[in-house]
Amino acid sequence: MSVQAMKRALLVLCCVLSVALMAAQAWAAPQKKAKARSQAPVVRDGEAEARLLEVYRLIGQAQGRQALAKAEALVTEHPNFQLAQLVYGDLLASQSRPLRALGDVPDAVAKSGAQLLSDLRDESALRIRALRERPPAGTIPAQFLQLSMRNKHAIAIDSSRARLYLFENTGGELKLLADYYISVGKSGIEKAVEGDLRTPLGIYFVTSNLDPKSLKDFYGVGALPINYPNPYDARRGKTGGGIWLHGTPPAQFSRAPKATDGCVVLANPDLQRIIRTVEIRTTPVVIADKLNWVTPQSVQPDSRRFADTLQAWRAAKASADMTRLLAFYSADFSFYGKNLAEWTPALRSELDKARGRDIQLKDVSYLHWTDSADTMVVTFGEVPEGARSGPVKRQYWLRQGTQWKIFFEGVIG
């Protein structure tokens, strides 16, 4: 290798490592709220990634000069984008020698930054994979069996692809608005206990929108907590909490694919788009190992079958026949520590207040989750006959043999 090439390669890795050091310092040190945050130029969500992928495309077409120019512009505008810095450095080095791999720096330098290089290569591969393996047109994640008009938006996360998908629900039809690169737990997925550094799998809902002024800079432009552990998690003895969708510190554009304590982390421009878009309490968040994309028509039979079960429950409740109604509840039903026998008086009180009036279920949504068991998360408004409104309830159903049984029921609004 020529002295000139060596200097360029060293310069590249120094750039990348310096960004990493800045990120580490931003993480470890107590941070004051930066006034510059509100003065930063507006960056469109997904823009930086799209520009990086364009650089990749130009490289693939052997248009090195154009790729170098675009990479230089990208790192000038986003100096904290470590992966872009690495690609830019490779393009500089390629002017004097052929490259062997992404992050092609001298062996001694590569050894000292081995973990960082490995993380950046993984991030690069996942971003390219997301471009190449797009969801088939007209498909949705299989978990979205039926959404109501109250669910104006929905989020689905595919951890195997390090990807978050943002949907808009219009007239019962889901439209994919955008998708973004994400980071998950250092130890991967399937959270079980507090402190295991894993991201949970399941069906959740956005519970709040935390004011960025109340957060450390480490969390970026904001945070959207979700309701982990949900009743299904609690049923299986899962512990922990504080799982958020949040941004990155100022010194870091994005994080390694597995870099969090269990949260889902996005680039700040991407998170800002999500924060501006989704609604609190009504936005479902599906976190899966791998999403199964299906046509809406293919899930209609399952939706209709479950709708029949739910209507049978409604009819039983309207009948005020306690024995008939309790047949829909699992023997191991649990409501925040109360078993079925302890919770039954509350159900009896509801029947007494209804005085035999019929009830209607409005704004019904079904979210289907399958792992070692088959579950359904159901949300609806329960409106007594003659009333204009009623409580919003959420039920968790479990398939037991050939029947669906309720193992949790609560009022959420």
Give residue spans per PLM region.
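Alpha-helical segment of the N-proximal tetratricopeptide repeat
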Residues: 44-73, 77, 312-315
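Surface-exposed, charged secondary-structure patches
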Residues: 150, 346-394
